[in-house]
Amino acid sequence: MLSDAAKALLALKSLGRHQSGSEILASPEKLSALLSLSTLYKDDPDASSEALRCIANALLLIQSSRETFLKPPVNGGEICLNALEKSTNPEQIFVLARILFLSTALLPDYIVTFIENKHNGRPVVEIIGAKLDLLYICVLNSTRMAKEAMTDLLKFAYNFIHHYPKAVQENPQSQAAEEDEKKVLGDYWSPKLDGLLPPLLRIFGSLPPSFPNPITPPLTHVIHALIGIPVSPSLKNVWFPSRSAVNSPKSAPQTPHSDHRSDSRCGSPIMQSPPPSARPGAFDRALSVLSAGRRSFSRCSSPHVSSNSDILHRAWDLLEVAFNHFFADNIDPDDPKVRELLKDSSDNSLDALLSPLVILITRLCQADETSRARLKQWLVPDDLDRESPLEQRQDMFGKSLRLLTSVYHNRLKDSVGEMLYAMAGSDASNLSTLIGYGNAAGFLFNKGILSAPPASSSTNGDVASSVRDDINPITGTTFKPKPNLPEMTEEEKEQEVEKLLWLFDRLEKTGAMPADQNPIRKAIQDGKATLGP
C-alpha cells in the first residue's frame, strides 16, 4: 500500500498534469521543495518517485521552468545527476532521466557544465554508460519500466551528442564543418564523449529485437545516438572491435563501466556475441539473438556485456527483417498496404522509422573500405542473377531499387540512395555499373550529376568483378539476343510515318508543342523530308 506521503504526492502529481497546476509547481521554491521531498523519502520509493514525477510534469508543460530548475538556487541538474549515479531502480532511473532530458533539451550551455564537472567523483559519460549496462540487464529480465528508463536515458545521452561537440567545436569532422556557419549533427566531435560509444554498441549488438517490426524503442534511440558519433580513425577500433581483436592478439573485449551496485530486480547475465560466420536467414538470426538473451538470465552478480560484436552485420540483419516486414515480396513501397503496417508503430512514417538505420549503415561504409566490400557482396554479389529486371527482385537489392523511385517515402528513398552510393565507393560510374544507369539516374540527378557518367578509370576490383560484357549498362541486366524479325515493307514504313505525323500534329494543335519545335515540320522546312512522292 502507498504511504500517506506517497498518496499526497500522487494527488499533487495529478494536479500538475494540467498547465495551471504545473505553473504553480514551476517556481524555484516549489521545485526545490519537491527535490527535498524526493531526498527526504529516499527509503520510500513510491513517495520519492511521485515527487520527481511532479517535477517532470512541470518541466514538460512549462518550458521556462527548465532553466529555473537548472540554475541556482534550485541546482536541480546537479542533484538529479548525483541521484542517478546512486540509483539502481529502473523506475527511479526513468524519472531522473526524463527530468534531465527535458531540462537539457534546449539549453546547451548546461550540457557543457555537466560534461566539464564530475558528479560524485565520476564524469557524466561514465555514469550514463554504467546505467545503460545496468538497464540492459533489466530489459533482458523484463523488469518493470526498464525499457522506458533506457529510452529516456538514451534521449538524455543524445542531448550530449547533439549539443556538446557544437558548443566546444574541438574536432571538425569535415572541411564543410569549418566553412559552414550553421552547425549540424556530426560536424564536430569531442573525445570527452568517446565513452558513450562502447555501451551504445553493446546494447545495439545484443538487445533482443521485437517482432514483426524489429525497430522499436529503445533500439530506435540507440540508433539515433550512434549516427551522431563519427566513425573516425581514433574510434575505428571501438566501432570494429572484432577486427582489431584479430589484428592484435593482446586486445580483449572492452568491459562496461562497473556500477559496483547490484539489484536483485535486474539480475546480471553475461552476453557474448559470437563471431560473424555464414549468413543464415535474417529472421532466423534475429530469433537466435532473442533466444540467447532469454537463456542468459541471472548468470552472475555483475553486468558483463561484450562489445566485441559485428556492428555492420547486426545493422544489416535489422534492416533486412524490417524491409521484409514492410515491403514483403516485391510490393511497391508506395502501396497503401505498406502504410497500413505503420499503425502499430510508434513512428508515423517509414522515413522516421527506417532512415536512421540506413544512415548508420551508410556512415560505416563511407568510413570503412571493408564494410563497403561486405555490403556489396550482400547486395550485389558477383554471381547475381541478372536475367530478369533488377528492380523486380524480391530480395534486399530489389527492395532497395524500388525505393529509389518512391514518391511517398522521400527521406528513406534518399537514404537508400546514399547507402548504395557509399557501397559503390561514392563513385557515380561504379554505381551505374552495379545497378544500371536507369535505376541510378534519378538519384544521380538529385546529386547534380545530370548525364550518364563515363566509365571510371578508378573502378575498383570489387566492382569490376561484377561487370560482364553481356550486361546492359542501362538496365543492369544481361543482353538478350534480338529476334530475327523480317524487314518492314514500304507500305508498313509509310503507315508508321503517318502515325508520327498525326501524333506531332496533335501535340502542336493542343499547344503541348510549339510549332517551331515540331521535328517533322523542321525536317520538311530544311528539305530533309517530304509529305509524299
Question: Predicted segment positions?
Answer:
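Elongated alpha-helical scaffolds that mediate protein-protein interactions in large eukaryotic proteins
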Residues: 1-151, 162-194, 232-245, 305-308, ...
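Alpha-helical solenoid repeats of the armadillo/HEAT superfamily
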Residues: 2-13, 42-60, 86-108, 140-165, ...
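Eukaryotic scaffolding regions of large macromolecular assemblies
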Residues: 263-483
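Long, compositionally biased acidic/polar linker segments
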Residues: 195-201, 208, 248-251, 255-310, ...
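Generic secondary-structure transition motif, activating predominantly at the C-termini of alpha-helices
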Residues: 132, 327, 379, 448, ...
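Acidic, Ser/Thr- and Gly/Pro-rich intrinsically disordered linkers and low-complexity segments
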Residues: 1, 126-148, 166-184, 195-217, ...
